[in-house]
């Protein structure tokens, strides 16, 4: 096709990203083609987006740096892989695969497993007071059982506590950011039990069906030129999922062009409003619901609550009770409507009674509670993706951009490759699956 006499120039329509740029240019060079080529850069497969893309084809030279970055990545992978794999295979007398990304990720799981194996649980005790004012207050953790039992006996003997301090702080949680691929994969693993690869496959299929924008993005913001069309997209998204109640839309919360690289954050498209969502496979439908819910939440208002801490004294020991009152549901209203059946059931926080400082309060009962410290948790795909995303962040100098290990589009591939090599795998069922090192890993 490149060498046909009726072809004057070529349009690079490969994936709009670093690896897509590399794939095209490797084919172009291998074919020995010298004809000029331009770049089609798309973030959506909708017809209007494709037409706009062809109307604004970019010179290929604008993407030379992207190609060079991909070429460096490819050669670094090859040099590390072929040299280190041969070295360690010879040293240990068996085939061992070493990779620029796979090996550090495997090391994370090995270090975590070692910490779990070496962990020795420690017992601790607390004394809980049931106050007649209507709340439960707990002591600090006590390592010695005798000391805890002595405190319990003293409290049962005294049966009176004095309210020392009551503090009330109003707090808020801002709406979550829009999804990039990694954040979507983490939530899909945590809420749906999907592996990172399953989520990527579902998202890719939705993209090809023109129901979401480009999935392999590492941005969680939108560009300024998208602000005008966003309210309409929010309305269409709410309508597609029968969530049509009017609510304040704060577009500027998700607009920041300086934080958009190759692609903006993941979004549903306007085509979704006309699609038969019930006909989608269940996995795709659930991933689409996550992406849509995140859009509706991201433009919402803060979740506001008041947190009250009560400190009381009994038998010379401090006891603490905490309570929480929701002042405004904000974006959590939309989250509950869109994802209610997927969200984990959390214990409702206690509402503390209205009490005054320095007043005495009777103790209705006192009880000894026993617990023990917990080992570090096994990685799940959710927490492993987060560890990859934030790798070495603590040791990086201030002001240095933190990139982590791997890219959103290939992080799941490294875990899958380690599994195929017999170096790691998942244990457990569905959402509780842990990632652990196996065999040679």
Q: Model-flagged regions — what are they?
A:
Residues 1-392, 396-423, 428-433, 440:
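Toprim catalytic domain recognition across nucleic-acid enzymes
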């Amino acid at each position: 096709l490149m060498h046909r006499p009726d072809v004057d120039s070529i349009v690079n329509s490969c994936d709009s990203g670093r690896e897509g740029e590399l794939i095209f240019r490797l084919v172009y060079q291998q074919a020995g083609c010298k004809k000029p080529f331009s770049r089609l850069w798309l973030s959506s497969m909708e017809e209007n987006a494709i037409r706009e893309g062809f109307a604004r084809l970019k010179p290929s030279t604008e993407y030379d740096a992207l190609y060079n970055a991909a070429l460096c990545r490819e050669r670094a992978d090859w040099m590390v892989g072929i040299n280190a794999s041969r070295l360690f295979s010879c040293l240990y007398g068996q085939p061992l695969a070493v990779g620029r990304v796979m090996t550090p990720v495997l090391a994370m799981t090995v270090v975590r497993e070692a910490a779990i194996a070496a962990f020795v649980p420690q017992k601790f005790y607390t004394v809980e007071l049931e106050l007649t004012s209507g709340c439960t207050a707990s002591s600090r953790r006590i390592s010695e059982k005798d000391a805890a039992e002595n405190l319990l006996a003293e409290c049962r003997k005294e049966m009176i506590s004095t309210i020392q301090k009551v503090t009330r702080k109003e707090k808020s949680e801002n709406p979550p950011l829009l999804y990039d691929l990694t954040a979507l994969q983490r939530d899909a693993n945590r809420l749906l039990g999907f592996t990172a690869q399953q989520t990527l496959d579902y998202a890719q299929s939705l993209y090809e069906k023109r129901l979401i924008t480009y999935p392999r993005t590492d941005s969680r913001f939108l560009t300024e030129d998208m602000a005008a069309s966003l309210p309409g997209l929010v309305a269409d998204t709410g309508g597609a999922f029968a969530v049509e109640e009017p609510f304040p839309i704060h577009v500027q919360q998700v607009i920041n062009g300086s934080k958009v690289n190759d692609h903006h954050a993941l979004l549903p498209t306007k085509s979704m409003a006309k699609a038969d969502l019930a006909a989608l496979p269940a996995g795709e439908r659930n991933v689409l619901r996550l992406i849509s819910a995140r859009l509706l939440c991201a433009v919402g208002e803060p979740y506001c609550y008041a947190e009250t801490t009560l400190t009381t004294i009994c038998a010379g020991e401090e006891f603490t009770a905490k309570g929480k009152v929701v002042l405004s549901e904000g974006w959590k209203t939309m989250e509950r409507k869109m994802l209610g059946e997927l969200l984990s059931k959390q214990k409702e926080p206690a509402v503390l009674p209205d009490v005054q400082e320095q007043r005495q309060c009777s103790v209705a009962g006192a009880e000894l509670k026993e617990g023990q410290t917990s080992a570090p948790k096994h990685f799940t795909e959710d927490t492993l993706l987060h560890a990859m995303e934030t790798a070495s962040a603590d040791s990086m100098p201030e002001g240095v951009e933190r990139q982590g290990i791997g890219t959103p589009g290939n992080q799941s591939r490294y875990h899958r490759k380690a599994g195929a090599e017999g170096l790691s795998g998942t244990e457990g069922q569905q959402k509780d699956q842990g990632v652990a090192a196996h065999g040679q890993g």
